[in-house]
């Protein structure tokens, strides 16, 4: 017992020989262990290489997708251009006649000219009446006789009492106006003279009438003798 040391006779909890393993493990790392550790860490390098290869493959896939998208866009553009070319009208085929447009937006100049020609063809005459705050326009050529024109005056100015236009023969037989007439239709001829409506034949009246005025009977009394004298001459 005297030859045994304190460490050998010390009682400890643990497996037999655990103390020696602890002593060995507490020492410095040996050369062999260091080499083994380096060899175990070397396989990490190929992993990095494989990551670079994956990135390269992803880039190639992205480039291929972009090229496919560009090809689709070029195909769409070519299809749209071909449709525009096919939509062009045939120069040999005659165009359809354009319909006349009335209202807004304003019509074009050539259509205005057509409307102006139609207005010139019609014998439009202004019609005014003493005491009426408005004017009218009528086409004298639309009517066939003086009685029709008289009815048109009655419809234009319904609130006034207008004398009926007699025939040319009736006016020649009477040299004065009736006193009971409130308004009498008169007209201005090409010479600028004011005369009673009905003092000349209807065809001559249509050609010479420039303006119509329905004046009061008291103001038109002096026109009857002059109209009759002009008819006689």
From Swiss-Prot:
Signal peptide (UniProt feature, chain positions): none
Stimuli inducing this protein: Not induced by auxin.
Record function comment: Aux/IAA proteins are short-lived transcriptional factors that function as repressors of early auxin response genes at low auxin concentrations.
Compositionally biased intervals (Acidic residues): 54-63
UniProt xrefs under InterPro entries: AUX/IAA_dom, AUX_IAA, PB1-like
Organism: Oryza sativa subsp. japonica
Domain of life: Eukaryota
Protein's name in the database: Auxin-responsive protein IAA11
Assembly notes: Homodimers and heterodimers.
PB1 domain: residues covered: 122-217
Segments of this protein annotated with the region Disordered: 1-27, 46-100
Tissue: Highly expressed in etiolated shoots. Expressed in roots.
Single biological process term from Gene Ontology: auxin-activated signaling pathway
């Amino acid at each position: 017992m005297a030859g045994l040391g304190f460490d050998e006779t010390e009682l400890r909890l643990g497996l037999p020989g655990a103390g020696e393993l602890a002593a060995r493990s507490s020492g410095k790392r040996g050369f062999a262990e260091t080499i083994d550790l380096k060899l175990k860490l070397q396989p990490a390098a190929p992993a990095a290489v494989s990551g670079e290869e994956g990135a390269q493959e992803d880039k190639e896939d992205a480039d291929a997708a972009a090229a496919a998208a560009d090809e689709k866009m070029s195909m769409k553009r070519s299809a749209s251009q071909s449709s525009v070319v096919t939509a062009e009208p045939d120069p040999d085929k005659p165009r359809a006649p354009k319909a006349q447009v009335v209202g807004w937006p304003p019509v074009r100049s050539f259509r205005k000219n057509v409307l102006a020609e139609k207005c010139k063809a019609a014998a439009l005459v202004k019609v005014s009446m003493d005491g009426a705050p408005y004017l009218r326009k009528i086409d004298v050529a639309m009517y066939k006789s003086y009685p029709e024109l008289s009815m048109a005056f009655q419809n234009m100015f319904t609130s006034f009492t207008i004398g009926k236009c007699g025939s040319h023969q009736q006016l020649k037989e009477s040299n004065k106006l009736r006193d009971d007439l409130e308004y009498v239709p008169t007209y201005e001829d090409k010479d600028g003279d004011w005369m009673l409506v009905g003092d000349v034949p209807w065809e001559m009246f249509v050609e010479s009438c420039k303006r119509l005025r329905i004046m009061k009977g008291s103001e038109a009394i002096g026109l009857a003798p002059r109209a009759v004298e002009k008819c006689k001459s």
